[in-house]
């Protein structure tokens, strides 16, 4: 053949990259919006290629760009990310008050969505997200990750095995399920909201207007943003709507 005559050897791509190698052309491309907390866990997934990250906090953005290396572009405005035609999937790891609107806008931009829990702050917002996904033919995955990791709330109980037992009928029917919060972490202590907070200057690195987004305009205080935002109805759906999903979702799955 011409190839043999030229002394050219064609090596299968899996040989160069190993048995689990996925060439860039076959990988899904993604962007992660919100990299100050849970978004760090969305940066590196097998079979995907990270193209962009976005955060309203410049410190979060710069530190994460150093971590992921070259080839990844940083943004302060998520709308610029959605305009990129080369992004297949948008990972949303912002506070919950942004989940609904960002998911809908991502679907409108032709992106599939992988969203951190809770899906949205309210049931009504969640219904709008479902409608948008159906209308635009996009996929939506909610990252209730204890189900996917098959480890009920990190306590070692395999969810899939428990589902098999329930499906077998060995436990009888109907079942009564009691959910308790024995996790070794006091959510209420760490994430309870505070009243009468004195307004403070907005840090230079934070685009506070972008962080607030669709939430009511309130004076800045560090306790209302980042890790402690969960204690405020403006940004989250309370303990049951947020961390409660980790308990409730696996139960819904195996029932």
Describe every region a protein language model picked out:
Residues 49-68:
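NAD(P)-binding Rossmann-fold cofactor-contacting core
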């Amino acid at each position: 053949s011409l190839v043999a005559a030229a002394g050219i050897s064609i090596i299968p791509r899996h040989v160069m990259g190993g048995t689990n190698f996925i060439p860039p052309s076959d990988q899904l491309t993604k962007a992660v919006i919100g990299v100050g907390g849970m978004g760090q866990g969305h940066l590196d997934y097998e079979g995907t290629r990270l193209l962009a990250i976005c955060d309203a906090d410049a410190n979060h953005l710069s530190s994460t760009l150093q971590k992921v290396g070259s080839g990844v572009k940083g943004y302060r405005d998520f709308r610029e990310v959605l305009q990129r035609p080369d992004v297949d999937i948008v990972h949303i790891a912002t506070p919950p008050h942004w989940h609904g609107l960002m998911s809908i806008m991502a679907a409108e931009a032709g992106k599939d969505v992988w969203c951190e829990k809770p899906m949205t702050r309210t049931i009504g917002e969640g219904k709008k997200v479902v409608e948008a996904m159906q209308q635009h033919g996009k996929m939506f995955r909610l990252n209730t990750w204890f189900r996917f990791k098959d480890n009920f709330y990190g306590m070692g109980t395999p969810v899939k095995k428990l589902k098999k037992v329930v499906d077998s009928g060995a436990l009888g029917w109907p079942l009564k399920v009691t959910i308790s919060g024995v996790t070794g972490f006091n959510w209420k202590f760490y994430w309870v909201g505070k009243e009468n907070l004195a307004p403070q200057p907005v840090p230079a690195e934070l685009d506070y207007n972008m962080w607030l987004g669709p939430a009511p305009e309130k004076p800045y205080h560090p306790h209302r943003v980042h890790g402690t935002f969960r204690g405020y109805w403006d940004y989250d759906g309370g303990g049951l709507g947020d961390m409660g999903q980790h308990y409730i979702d696996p139960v819904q799955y195996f029932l």
